[in-house]
């Protein structure tokens, strides 16, 4: 399943190290947010969260 397959509204807090905005997710993959940051259409495979958000390198 595409990790970005979720509504782009509301917050997404995946544990203590992964926080995304503009999405509506409740779970998080080990190496990547289960949702995309605003303006990101698709997460790159194998991307990792940097700090408290998914870095732009996560997007493709």
Swiss-Prot record:
Binding site for a divalent metal cation 7: 49, 54, 58-59
Binding site for a divalent metal cation 6: 36, 40, 43, 59
Residues where a divalent metal cation 3 binds: 14, 18, 23, 28
Protein residues bound to a divalent metal cation 2: 6, 12, 14, 25
UniProt-annotated binding residues for a divalent metal cation 4: 32-33, 43, 47
Location of region: Beta: 1-28
Region (Alpha): 29-60
Sorted UniProt keywords: Metal-binding, Metal-thiolate cluster
Binding site for a divalent metal cation 1: 4, 6, 20, 23
Gene Ontology MF term list: metal ion binding
Residues annotated to bind a divalent metal cation 5: 33, 35-36, 49
Entry superkingdom: Eukaryota
Annotated InterPro entries: Metalthion_dom_sf (IPR017854), Metalthion_dom_sf_vert (IPR023587), Metalthion_vert (IPR000006), Metalthion_vert_metal_BS (IPR018064)
Role played: Metallothioneins have a high content of cysteine residues that bind various heavy metals.
PANTHER family the record matches: METALLOTHIONEIN, METALLOTHIONEIN-1X
Family according to the record: Belongs to the metallothionein superfamily. Type 1 family.
Domain statement: Class I metallothioneins contain 2 metal-binding domains: four divalent ions are chelated within cluster A of the alpha domain and are coordinated via cysteinyl thiolate bridges to 11 cysteine ligands. Cluster B, the corresponding region within the beta domain, can ligate three divalent ions to 9 cysteines.
Protein name according to UniProt: Metallothionein A
């Amino acid at each position: 399943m595409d990790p970005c397959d979720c509504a782009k509204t509301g917050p997404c807090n995946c544990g203590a190290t992964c926080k995304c905005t503009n999405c509506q997710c409740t779970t998080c993959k080990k190496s990547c947010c289960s949702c995309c940051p605003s303006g990101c259409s698709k997460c790159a495979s194998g991307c990792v969260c940097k700090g408290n958000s998914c870095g732009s390198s996560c997007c493709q």
